[in-house]
């Protein structure tokens, strides 16, 4: 006996409706963070060739404002990003301990290559090395949360 395709599809959809992924446990989260820091993200020992200066920080803030604010907000802490609570995996605050524990070289590697499948795109070929390193300086000295307002793209 052949079941109509709509019956099979309906049974499959009902079965899938009950499926839900649980958030990772603490040990799963810590394992992923450890693996990212020690195995998946390159350039751990690379040093930022740009010294910290207000001009380099301003350059980093400018580059960040063109390429990063849609997901990370003007302050790097997701302020004013309307979809922030609906993204999986979640977009981290760049002030978080997890992000700040990367070396400068690892942060540049992430900016260059992105983190798949998180949605973080790579910028290799789009931004110069100096722009990337200046963004790293900006990330190390983020302004206070909420102090930069909401990205313009979300206020119109």
Labelled PLM ranges:
Residues 2-9:
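Sec-dependent signal peptide recognition
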Residues 39-40, 55, 61, 65-88, ...:
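Periplasmic/extracellular electron-transfer cofactor-ligation site
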